[in-house]
């Protein structure tokens, strides 16, 4: 793990005012969308590999160019395909017991395609007008997150970008608590976990992580986030419990499945580390108890 923290002040206008590059949205398409062409792209997208999503995105974008960038569903499909390719390649910029996966290689992916995905998503929401649903908001959120990630979301947590990121997460959480396993609560948990003081909050991080489990279900991602955040807060017993549960859990949505193998692998590593820390704590407690007992014996009158 959807960690979620967060480009420059201009990104704060992403909730409707952000300037986008590329062709602007037209009032109506000059040509009807070719359903056969879109169907071919849909079939590629369903394969859920980075390469197939790349191919699907190109077909969607070529069709958008041909028809005038006015079809909301096609715009969102294109954004979703680009998002998915990035999610697969970079493990969704999720959190780990070591922090994040903001590596140079991953940042290069986000720099190349993040803004592209956001432009498509923003146009899609504009074309929808007042018919914005959970899917559209989720696609825009992921695109925004990826568009900022190449500059490190953690470093931008205290900027307008961080504010916009949090507001988008809160909107998903409030309006669509069951969408994608309560992804709104999940991304807020990651935000509060990685953001520096005064925005970061261990209490809010674990509260939102547990809320995602309660409202969105005990999915792989949701359990993994509780485990990682608990580990970061030195609650190794809870971390071990939830890592065990995550290892046995299934992804709750296609987007979770995109980086499920990574979360499973990290959960196994996290479990081993949590158990190691618990063992060390037990040894320390035994040593303290032994020393206390020895001191008590010395203090007894002879």
Indicate residue ranges for each PLM-predicted region.
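Mid-length scaffold segments of soluble, non-membrane domains
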Residues: 175-177
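Short, solvent-exposed mixed-charge patches
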Residues: 300-302
């Amino acid at each position: 793990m959807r960690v979620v923290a967060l480009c420059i002040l201009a990104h704060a206008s992403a909730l409707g005012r952000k300037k986008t590059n590329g062709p602007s949205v037209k009032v109506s398409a000059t040509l009807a969308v070719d359903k056969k062409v879109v169907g071919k792209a849909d079939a590629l997208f369903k394969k859920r590999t980075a390469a197939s999503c790349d191919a699907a995105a190109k077909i969607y974008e070529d069709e958008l160019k041909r028809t005038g960038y006015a079809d909301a569903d096609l715009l969102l499909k294109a954004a979703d395909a680009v998002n998915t390719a990035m999610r697969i390649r970079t493990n969704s910029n999720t959190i780990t017991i070591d922090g994040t996966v903001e590596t140079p290689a991953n940042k290069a992916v986000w720099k190349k395609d993040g803004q592209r995905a956001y432009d498509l998503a923003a146009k899609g929401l504009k074309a929808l007008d007042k018919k914005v649903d959970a899917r559209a908001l989720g696609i825009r959120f992921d695109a925004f997150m990826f568009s900022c990630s190449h500059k490190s979301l953690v470093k931008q947590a205290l900027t307008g970008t961080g504010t916009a990121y949090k507001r988008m997460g809160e909107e998903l959480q409030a309006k669509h608590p069951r969408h994608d396993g309560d992804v709104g609560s999940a991304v807020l948990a990651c935000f509060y976990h990685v953001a520096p003081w005064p925005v970061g909050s261990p209490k809010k991080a674990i509260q939102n992580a547990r809320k995602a489990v309660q409202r969105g279900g005990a999915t792989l991602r949701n359990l993994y986030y509780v485990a990682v955040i608990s580990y970061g807060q030195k609650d190794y017993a809870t971390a071990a419990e939830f890592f065990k549960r995550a290892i046995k859990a299934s992804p709750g949505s296609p987007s979770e499945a995109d980086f499920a193998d990574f979360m499973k692998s990290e959960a196994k590593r996290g479990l081993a580390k949590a158990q190691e820390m618990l063992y060390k704590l037990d040894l320390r407690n035994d040593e303290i108890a032994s020393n206390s007992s020895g001191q008590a014996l010395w203090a007894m009158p002879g």
